[in-house]
Amino acid sequence: MYFVIVLFGLFSNTAYGQITVTQFNAGWNSANDVPWIMGLKDCKSLGYSDIAKNSEEATKYKIAVVPTIIIFKDGEEAVRFQADLSFKMVATKEEVQEAIDELLRSDF
């Protein structure tokens, strides 16, 4: 039984260790922050980057509109969700979670 638990632990860390999610926004657009991002599941980490304070991040990830949510798999961009012209995120929590789940399923 102990072996099964250890094996499951190793397997789950491998699967979950690949996905990170970052929200890119700017302080002047804080009214349109995406609060539900911290409730996403099966991610190694969830982050926030204020591109008004860290313009290098905006350049590095080619952020054209805020907020933008990027899902990274193994350190590489896998999926991007961007706000509409009114600077509001159009993607839902369910859509972002489904993208995460699909990336995890693609490993099997």
Where are these regions (language model features)?
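Sec-dependent signal peptide recognition
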Residues: 1-7
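Non-catalytic, surface beta->alpha helical segment in thiol-disulfide oxidoreductase systems
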Residues: 71-108
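Local sequence-structure signature of Cys/Sec-based thiol-disulfide redox active-site neighborhoods
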Residues: 15-47
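N-terminal post-signal-peptidase region of extra-cytosolic proteins
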Residues: 51-57
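Structural micro-motif
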Residues: 61-72
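Short, glycine/charged-enriched secondary-structure capping and boundary segments
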Residues: 35-38, 63, 84-85
